Amino acid sequence: MEGEYYIIKSPDGKVLEVKDFNTENGAGIQLWSFAGHPWQQWQFVDAGEGRWRIQNRFTGKMIDLALGGVVEGTWLHQWSRTSGLSQCWTLEPTRSGRTRIRNVLSDKYIDLVGMNTANGAQAQIWNYVAGGNQEWTLERIDPDAAQAGKRAGEAKDPQPTPSQRKHQNDLVRKLHSAGKGRAGRKA
């Protein structure tokens, strides 16, 4: 897992990124069309006990809860690594072959403000709701193709293929088991 980067893709094919490729603490996390940029790529850093910090490739900062908030609608932003649980996440596989990403501190899921799927939609946390707005596909970035803006196993259809779904499920199991076994990159 160490050194591997992923995109966090919504059901419509857009991905989470750092807004305006800003390197400062507090820069928002938003949805945008995939273009292969490093501010759209994330590494899962083992935080122990099945928890993960999600670190941006470009900025080196973690997805965090704005102001450490825990209520529905708290926006996501990036922040330098801390020891706080506001930067810790668990991964939960879904029947659709995607993954829900739950914050440990708030016990809420990564979601989009107003269920918006347009470029620039702000990411937030929200209680569990059925449906695709909280379901994400974690796609490994092919290191050789990353600069060319291509994903490993890229498909035109935003629905995951059986092969992508299997890879997704394998990845979530691998991340979950690595976190419990304290293998992989340490927090």
Give the location of each predicted region.
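Short, tandemly repeated low-complexity microdomains enriched for cysteine and small residues
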Residues: 24-45, 68-90, 113-130
